[in-house]
């Protein structure tokens, strides 16, 4: 159960909106490798998010305790991760904080993607095209094409986003080196690549 004290949110409308967005996203998804939302409870002092229990703990701790994963186990877990992330992207959702600590294991050692605090939504039917994606680092191009314009509904075109978030060790370069627009799906794919490297025994989690 995830408990959020209302006094920790205060009167910050952005923080409160993020919490309700996370809950709304969890209500929309159903996949064997994504955490299930059982219930949301609100009181005057707290907001409670009751989630599926994953008895296997964090994948990060599992790798530390076992030092490495065998090829078949790593392949199976990564396939489950890709399946879950692919499902999210088809639903118009990006996670933006994929990391070993946000991947839990159930009692059968299956991946459970959790922590949607940085997740956001986009229009999966609005494809940007290669020219736009290749020129996102150019402020003149972005301004000329009005890509930084927020459309009705609070989104930009396609999966364009600007908020820098996530965890540095897993973050895509465009999140680290600039404050320009980025494509949310590619940020998730980069994080999946970092996770794959962590699962492969020859590298090890500490790299």
Language model features with spans:
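Conserved N-lobe beta3->alphaC-helix segment of eukaryotic protein kinase catalytic domains
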Residues: 3-29
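Activation-segment/catalytic-loop signature of the eukaryotic protein kinase fold
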Residues: 40
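Conserved short submotifs of the Hanks-type protein kinase catalytic core
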Residues: 44-58, 62
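Activation segment signature within eukaryotic-like protein kinase domains
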Residues: 77-78
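Protein kinase catalytic-loop region centered on the HRD/HxD motif
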Residues: 81-93
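Conserved end of the kinase activation segment
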Residues: 156-157, 175-186
